[in-house]
């Protein structure tokens, strides 16, 4: 009985920890970050346009995403590539 109780406690702790560990890309080079509490979305959004036709993007964890035709807003690990 004690083993079952201990197992349930461990599973609960692991599940609670997984709920707060969203990971997002924070750079074009592939650097990642575990998002702070309250920021449950990953985002990639266009911040400027280069003369050669390319967009410059910003990658981050966020609580609310920017709107735009070239932006990505998602809620799973490493989804904002």
Swiss-Prot record:
Localisation per UniProt entry: Secreted
Tissue: Expressed by the venom gland.
The keyword ATP-binding is assigned to this record: no
Keyword Disulfide bond: yes
Domain of life: Eukaryota
Gene3D superfamilies from the UniProt entry: CD59
One GO molecular-function entry: acetylcholine receptor inhibitor activity
One annotated Gene Ontology cellular component of this protein: extracellular region
Keyword set, alphabetical order: Acetylcholine receptor inhibiting toxin, Disulfide bond, Ion channel impairing toxin, Neurotoxin, Postsynaptic neurotoxin, Secreted, Signal, Toxin
Xref: SUPFAM superfamilies: Snake toxin-like (SSF57302)
Disulphide linkage map: 24-42, 35-61, 65-73, 74-79
Signal peptide positions on this chain: 1-21
Alphabetical list of InterPro entries matching this protein: Snake_toxin-like_sf
UniProt similarity note: Belongs to the three-finger toxin family. Short-chain subfamily.
Known role: Snake venom neurotoxin that blocks neuromuscular transmission, presenting a postsynaptic action through the nicotinic acetylcholine receptor (nAChR). Has no cytotoxic activity.
This protein's name: Mipartoxin-1A
Source organism of the structure: Micrurus mipartitus (Red-tailed coral snake)
